Amino acid sequence: MRYQWRSLLFRSYRSSPRPFLSHHSRFQVISNSTRSFSSFLHERFGVQQRQCLFALRSPLASSVSRRFSSESAIEEKLPAETVVIDVFSRLNGKDEITKELDSNDVVISHELALRVLRELESSPDVAGRFFKWGLEAYPQKLSSKSYNTMLRIFGVNGLVDEFWRLVDDMKKKGHGVSANVRDRVGDKFKKDGLENDLERLKELFASGSMDNSVDKVCNRVCKIVMKEVWGADVEKQLRDLKLEFKSDVVKMVLEKLDVDPRKALLFFRWIDESGSFKHDEKTYNAMARVLGKEKFLDRFQHMIEEIRSAGYEMEMETYVRVSARFCQTKMIKEAVELFEFAMAGSISNTPTPHCCSLLLKKIVTAKKLDMDLFTRTLKAYTGNGNVVPDVMLQHVLKSLRSVDRFGQSNEVLKAMNEGGYVPSGDLQSVIASGLSRKGKKDEANELVNFMEASGNHLDDKAMASLVEGHCDAKDLEEASECFKKMIGKEGVSYAGYAFEKLVLAYCNSFQARDVYKLFSELVKQNQLKPWHSTYKIMVRNLLMKKVARDGGFEEALSLLPMMRNHGFPPFVDPFMDYLSNSGTSAEAFAFLKAVTSKKFPSNSMVLRVFEAMLKSARHSEAQDLLSMSPSYIRRNAEVLELFNTMKPEKCSLEKPLPAPAQIEA
């Protein structure tokens, strides 16, 4: 029977239980995200940055601050139309233009071409240069709307000759002049007194030539197809139109029939078998986009295989839109198969790194993290020789954190490592910090072991982030062990930051004396050189009143020689506060002995101690200290004058400085 496909298409559709693409198919499936439908189409990251939907703008800033626990910030890219306008405003050479666009990951699409032209309405030279370049480089991307937009630019800017030349070109290509262009340009002609051109424009419409514009033809065809059940009568009405079907018309008809994919497919088959039109890459892809829905999954599969069999490629616009639909409807497995298929196409037409990143984000945020799908996506991407960039892992990590699955970051890292990826030091820090801060002790240790096994040790920044994370999680014991492992592997050269975080965490947990033991051990046995600020934190906390009474004062004193040996000036302010408030004369004398490498400190230091005690009305303790001092101090004129001028009846009690509480870095 003629057109046997008709009866098949009218059968009730039943979902096929078989996979999207059988494993016998030599075609794999690719995934380029689609706009929802329009926004996703223009968000391409790599070679087609603005064509991926679900774009979470975002690429993480890869630097980690001195805290090493910072989250990557997402770097926002300029809109593609802004980049294109800038390029064509500056450059003229084709090679220069192409190179510049490629370096900015810009790919021309129908929508992008329209946006660029609309932005350039007041710049006809730049618009004309872009349009001419587009005709040569991407003729299939310039639709009837693009032609009309360029026509309007010529008309409203008074470029009459260029306007009529383009009208003639449009007639040859089957494009009509829109009513909007007629009205806008007609007003311009009238204003400029161009009566002949105005009359010519009116005649163009009066002749009825516009009845064959793409939009008009499309509307007539769609009205016939949608009005009745498909049959011989519908086919007769279509033949009676006596239309010469062109690619743009067929594509537009299929897009408008998107609401009824069955009728779109009937029209698609009929127009080919009736000899009215031979399908090209543009119309094949338009049909595939219409069928790319859950209900028509089998037919979509057959269509994209048919595209390849006919010697054409699945356009990125097709991949992007269909992939977006799959992801929106939670068809993640089908989206991965589509990605595999697309990656098996020509190298110049495969999904970009950004599209791969978007799909990976959808996988890790799905109801259940399917690592098999994650691995398949990476294999499809790296199979073409692509290299996984840091930004891809950054996006995935952010997505894991958003669904509280950061603990599974090791699984993700292992899968990416199989493709040859090694995370940068900054990303190692992000993972290490994230795991330890969440209290994922086992996972944090697993990260260290995995990196070692793969021959890539965590660097000093990442180890510091691990220590800091354990500190933030209040797991001081694990933080201490981690720090010891760190200096055991990396040495003490870059341990200052991590050690200060460790000291601070102990002090804020009121365990200054515990961390003092670790402090002394590491300085004496491991030649650790703490920062000056770390010494200050230790001294302040050991001299807190209760801690000082229980032995903290003596421990704080012992830090003064260490400080001196490391080339730092002694930190004496907390000692002055302590001695003026509650310190004994014996403690004051011990301080004076410890603050210098000589037998006794300078007169100025001694005077400072006496003054602090006398100002706080601690005359008895000051007298005791004086009696313990060397004779040259007891006979010193300045010392005697100080005691004379600050006798009890002349000295007013000054409010002592408050004892330091928790110290922050």
From Swiss-Prot:
InterPro entries: BIR6-like, Pentatricopeptide_rpt, TPR-like_helical_dom_sf. It is found in: Mitochondrion. PPR repeats lie at residues 280-314, 315-349, 352-388, 389-423, 424-458, 459-493, 495-530, 536-570. Its main location: mitochondrion. PROSITE patterns: PPR (PS51375). Residues 1-37 form a transit peptide. One of its GO terms (cellular component) is mitochondrion. Disulfide bonds: none annotated. Keywords: Mitochondrion, Repeat, Transit peptide. GO terms for biological process: RNA splicing. It holds the Pfam family PPR. PANTHER family: OS01G0970900 PROTEIN, PENTACOTRIPEPTIDE-REPEAT REGION OF PRORP DOMAIN-CONTAINING PROTEIN. Belongs to the PPR family. P subfamily. This is Pentatricopeptide repeat-containing protein At3g02490, mitochondrial. The lineage of its organism: Eukaryota, Viridiplantae, Streptophyta, Embryophyta, Tracheophyta.
